[in-house]
Design a protein with these regions (language model features):
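Conserved hydrophobic positions within beta-strands
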Residues: 62-64, 105
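A broadly conserved sequence feature marking short terminus-proximal activation segments
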Residues: 1-27, 137-141
């Protein structure tokens, strides 16, 4: 049995430390704004004219800011298993950097297991393999305390009259909220 070499699916975006992988972003030397993936041309802060950046390791943990599922296979160059298996995606807020980073959620954790505010940590997982290599990417994994908190949030949502799986508006109020937004824009 030969062992395949683990390599990053995308070079330079994260470390391959199995115990404590880190996303590699950049930080503007003028204003301190973080970016991921690394910025090399101009600062993403619209009030800054900075064009010099330092590599910046980003936080390994964060909280779910938003999430969804990928029911349809992403287009090439994405390498998917055959047959395609849907997966959850999470936009994770990194508090120290004041930014949100998108990534897949580990297999076995779906949208029903997530909620806004779920604590997650960065891990490495295989995206695909060939004869010689195992190509890895970062993924988000809920921490040990997340399932109980997720159940509490779902229970609270049901008590507030929210639809199962929808964290945004109580049943019957979606149209009302949209009308208010449209009315405000006309003024």
């Amino acid at each position: 049995m030969t062992t395949k070499t683990r390599v990053p699916a995308i070079e330079g975006w994260f470390t391959l430390d199995e115990q404590a992988p880190i996303l590699l972003g950049s930080r503007c030397t003028s204003c301190g704004n973080f970016a991921f993936p690394k910025e090399t041309f101009f600062c993403r802060n619209p009030e800054c004219q900075g064009r010099e950046f330092a590599e910046a390791p980003l936080s390994r943990t964060g909280t779910v800011w938003s999430y969804t599922d990928a029911c349809y296979q992403p287009p090439k160059p994405y390498e998917a298993a055959d047959p395609y298996v849907p997966f959850a995606l999470a936009a994770v807020e990194l508090a120290a950097e004041q930014m949100v980073v998108m990534g897949q959620v580990v297999p076995g954790v779906g949208v029903d297991d997530l909620h806004i505010g779920t604590e997650v940590e960065l891990v490495l997982d295989t995206l695909y393999e060939d004869d010689e290599h195992e190509y890895v990417v970062w993924k988000w994994r809920p921490t040990a305390t997340a399932p109980a908190a997720g159940q509490e949030a779902r229970d609270a949502g049901r008590q507030a009259g929210r639809r199962p799986g929808c964290r945004h508006a109580p049943v019957g109020q979606v149209g009302t909220q949209l009308r208010r937004v449209r009315t405000r824009r006309r003024r």
